[in-house]
């Protein structure tokens, strides 16, 4: 690499004047010694010198400086910058090691933390539009035949066991129908072929006679139902 023509060297100081001869001598005595080690030893020896021993080298440095200023009156020290390619190489002197599977971000999460993250994602899914769901909840192809059969039997089971007043609320035939207006005797029931959809039907509307809750009677020998039923006894007295 050729040096620029306009580059002017700095004048030597007292240490450089002294070390110029000492460096050559030390390099001849220790040919395998690195240049940086030679500079370190020369610096240590220079500090051990007294002021009287340094005086001739200080005077020589002043003379060289005066001569340098006379030859280059407009001289200004401009340090040379490193080329850009060297700067790029120095940037990657200490590359980061690959941690692989020992990454603490992978192994540090416990099962509870993972479950909480999954639960948070499911809660966030509730605020998304329906089209963003990975699958349709009403798509019958997502369910097996056993699941569909259980879903069709579920309304009848609930109406017969857990809803004793289902008949008075318009749940006819054990199906989950919507309460409609008295003038329109139309209810909706789950489709037997596709439980995800409901279909209307024209079943009979609930009447006032169905509003009476079911009553269980215990009859002993010699007793009749008329004596126990207040509604029927009042009706007989009115007649």
Swiss-Prot record:
Acts as a negative regulator of transcription. May function as a switch in neuronal development. It comes from the Eukaryota. Keywords: Developmental protein, DNA-binding, Nucleus, Repressor, Transcription, Transcription regulation. GO terms for biological process: negative regulation of DNA-templated transcription; negative regulation of transcription by RNA polymerase II; nervous system development. InterPro entries: HMG_box_dom, HMG_box_dom_sf, SOX_fam, SRY-related_HMG-box_TF-like. It is found in: Nucleus. It comes from Xenopus tropicalis. One of its GO terms (cellular component) is nucleus. SUPFAM superfamilies: HMG-box. SMART domains: HMG. GO terms for molecular function: sequence-specific DNA binding. Residues 8-76 bind DNA. PROSITE patterns: HMG_BOX_2 (PS50118). The keyword Electron transport does not apply. Its main location: nucleus. This is Transcription factor Sox-14.
